[in-house]
Design a protein with these regions (language model features):
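Secretory targeting and sorting signals
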Residues: 1-32
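Extracytoplasmic/secreted proteins, especially bacterial periplasmic and envelope-associated proteins
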Residues: 46-49, 53, 70-90, 138-145, ...
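A non-catalytic alpha/beta surface segment that caps or lines the substrate-entry region
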Residues: 52, 56-110
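N-terminal capping segment at the start of a domain
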Residues: 34-70, 125-126, 279-286
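Alpha-helical metal-binding/catalytic segments enriched in His/Glu/Asp
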Residues: 107, 120-173, 305
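Metal-dependent peptidase/peptidase-like ectodomains
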Residues: 41-42, 166-263
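Sec-exported extracytoplasmic/periplasmic mature domains
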Residues: 52-60, 80-91, 147-155, 180-185, ...
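His/Asp/Glu-rich mid-to-C-terminal helical/loop segments that flank catalytic regions of hydrolases
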Residues: 264-314
Length: 314
């Protein structure tokens, strides 16, 4: 064989192998699973519109939305109505406390592995003293808009998604405790529970639950990308609806923007706001109205909820 013919044959063989490799690579790429879609931005105007509705409900019902009061049941009907319209499977879970009937709103998004349920929750009730717009209309409205975003995207999660609005948290997590007790053997099907209690405090901090490192990392990574420093949540530790889940051995996480603890100088440097003042000076008071909010914190935390729901359910 001549040298030139040998070179031509080698070149031909090399080209064939290269073409075959390219074909295989292209086919493999076409068959690869697509990357999960990123969570959408949650419109803070929509969250605030929900809070305005909760304020109107309180105004029309004696100034509060407390357990056993007409304002609470009207809040339940408002939340459930929006979820039903969006295509969620909803149920009202009843319980009794202090001689009054309470309600949890439970909403399941069809699809996903129900043996691995990612659950997000917030308490819907206020104290008797006021409308409870930050505590905890903020968390309730935040997860409502995330749930509606799930429906709008027609999300097809790998894990099942459930949202909950608990009653009578203010008397000691009564609604969430009732829910967890009724789970029975189905406790093992809850992959994680995320709690959102006060996410729009007017002098806000950015606190992340550290009860489970996997869930904590999801939130911390989100805020790190936005150059927002976070701290470990300690003020509300064991004082909100995540506690019954944690006691049952379920992984819990969540966010909190502060209540009646005072912001330090270092925190004011990181987050802005006023050092020496409470994160929420209207905590459990009549002034916890729709004016008692920080829009930026409400926006950032609502987006963080969406990020966690999308990531943990994929």
């Amino acid at each position: 064989m001549s040298r030139s013919a040998r070179i031509r044959r080698i070149a031909l063989a090399t080209g064939t192998v290269t073409a075959l490799a390219a074909t295989l690579f292209t086919a493999a790429g076409a068959q690869a699973d697509p990357a999960p879609a990123a969570a959408p931005d949650i419109d803070v105007k929509a969250v605030k519109a929900d809070l305005d509705q909760l304020q109107s409900i309180a105004d029309a019902n004696g100034g509060n939305r407390a357990h056993g009061q007409a304002g609470y049941k009207a809040s339940v009907d408002f939340i459930k109505g929006k979820l039903d319209k969006a295509g969620f499977k909803t149920q009202l879970q009843e319980f009794d406390n202090n001689g009054a009937k309470g309600y949890n709103v439970i909403a399941d998004w069809p699809g996903g592995d129900e043996s691995k349920t990612v659950m997000s929750g917030a308490h819907l009730d206020s104290v008797d003293a006021g409308p409870g717009i930050n505590d905890n209309g903020s968390g309730s409205a935040g997860i409502l808009e995330v749930a509606l975003a799930v429906a709008k995207a027609d999300l097809k999660p790998t894990k099942h998604l459930r949202f909950a609005w608990f009653g009578d948290e203010e008397d000691g997590m009564v609604g969430s405790q009732s829910y967890v007790e009724k789970l029975g053997a189905d406790k093992s099907k809850i992959d994680s529970y995320l709690n959102f209690d006060m996410i729009g405090s007017p002098n806000p901090g950015y606190f992340v639950y550290d009860d489970d490192s996997r869930l904590e990392k999801v939130f911390k990574d989100f805020f790190a990308k936005k150059n927002i420093a976070t701290e470990k949540e300690t003020e509300g530790d064991g004082r909100s609806d995540h506690a019954p889940f944690k006691d049952a051995g379920i992984a819990v996480g969540g966010l909190f923007s502060g209540a009646d603890y005072k912001k330090t100088e270092a925190q004011a440097k990181n987050w802005g706001g006023e050092a020496g003042k409470a994160f929420d000076a209207c905590y459990h008071q009549s002034c916890d109205t729709s004016k008692n909010l920080d829009d930026k914190a409400l926006d950032n935390n609502s987006d963080a909820i969406a990020h966690a729901v999308w990531e943990l359910s994929s």
